[in-house]
Amino acid sequence: MPLAVELAGVAFGYRPGQRVLEDVDLRIGEGEFVAVAGPNGGGKTTLVRLALGLQRPSGGRALLYGEAAHRFSRRRTLGYLAQRTELGGYAPTTVRELVAAGRLAAGGLIGPMRRRDRELVSEAIERVALADVADAPLRTLSGGMQQRAFIAKALAGEPSLLVLDEPTTGVDAESQESLAALLDRLHSELGVTILYVSHEFGAVERFVERLVLVRRTIIFDGPPSALPGVWHDPSHVHA
């Protein structure tokens, strides 16, 4: 299977002698749906940023589709939803405007969108079941619906890799389940590689093919069914 992400012997520290990650080996094949979990401060967000080339490792190598991640030439094919705790300047933006901005950014477009671009925006909104509120400001929507809108923004760019960092922050349990089911459907329909990053993995566990637990290094990598029973207790993972 061709690799979308490869980390080999990766280490990283913000200061000399203080490692956030060390000896990380991770390979994610094209088309996989993988969850990365671990305690806050355990290095999972740093791992993702290294994988995407947003930071460079102190040691080892990080590759995206076979290229050095920090020099990846097809960055517009990546959909990255960074951890977000509030809407900020997005509050008055409508769903359609947000998704259109994603299409414009991915296509490097300036000025009015072409017909095909408008179609992709509408398709992305429909895929996340927000067509009925496409012209509503984000601030009027629930947390779960807001997160769907940001997923649609990423989808409008036709990504080959979709990365979500803590997508369920501030979202209730029912919306977490709904979001996980949506990602599973998108994975099946589009064949996109999905990397789901969270300190909790319960909502997505039954949908992913692999679960990767990170606590400074990778302490588990395999199917959720192979996870030792004690690890299903979040207090154990977060210890």
Predicted ranges, named:
Residues 209-223:
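H-loop (His-switch) and adjacent beta-strand-loop-beta switch element
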Residues 60-74:
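Conserved ABC transporter NBD signature motif
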Residues 115-133:
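Conserved ABC ATPase "signature" region
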Residues 158:
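Conserved catalytic motifs of ABC-family nucleotide-binding domains
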Residues 162-165:
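Catalytic Walker B motif of ABC-type/P-loop ATPase nucleotide-binding domains
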Residues 52:
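Helix-to-loop junction immediately C-terminal to a conserved catalytic motif
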Residues 198-199:
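H-loop/switch region of ABC-family ATPase nucleotide-binding domains
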